[in-house]
Amino acid sequence: FKMGDSVCIMRDGKVVQTGTPEELSMQPANDYVRDFIQTADKTEVMSVKNIMITPSRIVRLGDSIDRAIQEMSRNNLSSVIVIDSALRPKGMLFIGEAIQARKEGKAIAQVLQTGINTIAEDTLVSDVITIATESSYPIAVTDTGGAMLGLVTKASILSTLS
């Protein structure tokens, strides 16, 4: 599958399916194609846009600490991803640090855990595995302008491998 952008699978001299390796992997035309694809490493043909998840809650950089704490408490979350006004991921905010920041009168930007990794939506899953294993945070999937589209977690990668 690494040999071309488009793949044609034939059986008995007839075209069964044509498409990108990712299309064949995600939408095999029939059992023949499915069996053929079965031997391929899905992480080598599948992009992260197919495994990313939508975060249950996000907080904006300009939001108040109180609002961030309310979002996390109301949704039983220990952390949230923080984005700026252009939807670019800026980092993670943890409930304990947010509560401490409220006591000290600090803003989200002052207690935000930066260093969140970002990847493009067309990045292959195989290229993200090492990043995910070395990161304490989910990986933000972004568009060409840097706006967040979703997250890749260790769990979403593991479900692809199974």
Residue ranges and their predicted role:
Residues 1-2:
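A short, surface-exposed alpha-helical micro-motif characterized by mixed small hydrophobic
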Residues 6-9, 13, 24:
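Conserved short hydrophobic beta-strand within the ABC ATPase nucleotide-binding domain
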Residues 15-19, 27, 92, 151:
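ABC ATPase "signature
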Residues 26-51, 162:
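C-terminal boundary and immediately downstream tail of ABC-type ATPase nucleotide-binding domains
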Residues 44-58, 94, 104-116, 123:
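Bateman (tandem CBS) regulatory domains
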Residues 58-77, 82-86, 99-102, 117-145, ...:
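The conserved cystathionine-beta-synthase
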